Amino acid sequence: MTGNMTDAPHGMISARPVMPPGGPPFMTQLYLIRHGENIDGKVDGAGPTVDLGLSERGRDQVARLSRRLMQSPSIKPSVLISSTERRASETAKLLGSACGLDVTERRAFEEWRSDDGTIEPDAFMAQWRAVKERDRAFHRFQPQSETQAEFFARVGAALHAVSEEHAGGSVLIVTHGGFIQAAFRHFFGFGDASFRRAYPAAAHASITHWRAEEGSDRWVLAYSNDVRHLEADGPA
């Protein structure tokens, strides 16, 4: 990675490349936002476990994030894209209302479609642990579900497409923890073994900022898992 790597607050990574004379370069900037805290449960106590939308705490997290975005001198998005899943959609609509942006929803930015909610968490993990490590990327929990390898390919394709579509623009993408983690694989070119040793954190309502200069074939991780807006005392 190019640039002078320095310690940054809140456990973030900061890359500060030297700017050319005449001002900052033409950049494509992607801000990956994880949705606020949500509630998972069964409708009327029956059926599969589903996303019931943002919790009260989640709405407060998004309100704090909205206030930060409105006050930020550096984050100036012109496009707001969201996963179609309820927790992300609700987050994006709150952000869009605060920032004056219309929301475009796309299924490509959804979380890993590992199962349909009918597998209980303990049973899911038991099945996962029973699969040989070399086979996990290709394991399908249910006939209609997405393998991990398919998920990683979807993430890469979605990020490539949006960066081409909005080249030179500043884009907010409201998505999920798994998607944000998989984005590190895409941008850094990590292989399957990378996340067996460590993985990046992606807290609720966090910001992870990637940028690319015009003419460069490399992306720069400006910062990740930035939640400074959640650390102030009191309600947003």
Residue ranges and their predicted role:
Residues D7-P17, G22-T28, I33-E105:
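Active-site-proximal alpha-helix that buttresses catalytic centers in soluble enzyme cores
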Residues G96-A157, A222-Y223, A236:
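Phosphate-handling substructures
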Residues G177-Q181, V220:
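GST superfamily/GST-like fold recognition
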Residues S72-K76, V162-G169:
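Glycine-rich phosphate-binding loop signature in dinucleotide/nucleotide-binding domains
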Residues G3-T28, T104-E105, E111-A123, G169, ...:
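Acidic, low-complexity terminal tails and accessory targeting/binding regions
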Residues G36, G177, N225-V227:
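Active-site metal-binding loops of divalent metal-dependent hydrolases
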Residues S82-S83, A153, V174-T175:
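Short beta-strand scaffold positions
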